[in-house]
Amino acid sequence: MQIFVDADACPAVIKDMLFRVARRTGICVTLVANQFLRTPPSPHIKALQVPAGFDEADARIVELAQPGDLVVTADIPLAAALLDKGAHPLDPRGNWFSRENIDERLSTRAMMEQLRSAGIDTGGPAPFSARDANAFASQLDRFVARHGKP
C-alpha cells in the first residue's frame, strides 16, 4: 500500500501529517504536482513533478495508483477514476469518496459548473479549519491501522 497526494492544492498541515505517517510506518508517500515541492529527507517520501497542464498531475496519479492505495485529493473526477482502479480516495477534509457517493458528487459538481458558466456566483468551499484537519487525521489513522504496514 502506498499513499499518493494530489499536492498542488493540498493544505500544508495535511502534507505534514502524511510525512509523519511515512516516517512512523515506512509507508511510501508520493506527492504529485506540476510545481516543485520541497519534502523532508526520507526514503519514504517522494515528490514527483509533472509538466504544467490541465489534469497532468491527475493523469499521473491514475497511472501510478494501484488497488488498495490511499490517494488524498479533493478532485471529484480524479476520485471517480481512482475508485474504478480500486484505490481509496480521501479528501483533505476527511471525507471518503465511495461508490455510494461519487455519482451525486459528480452531479453536484456539474450543476455548480453550469451555474458559474451562467454567471451565478456559487461561492466556494469554506476555509480549511482545524476541525477539517482533525477529521482527516482520524480517517488517516483508521486507514493506516487497517491497511498499512505493521
UniProtKB/Swiss-Prot annotation:
Signal peptide: none annotated. InterPro entries: UPF0178 (IPR003791). Coiled coil: none annotated. It comes from the Bacteria. CDD domains: PIN_YqxD-like. PANTHER family: UPF0178 PROTEIN YAII. Belongs to the UPF0178 family. This is UPF0178 protein Bcep1808_1605. It comes from Burkholderia vietnamiensis (strain G4 / LMG 22486).
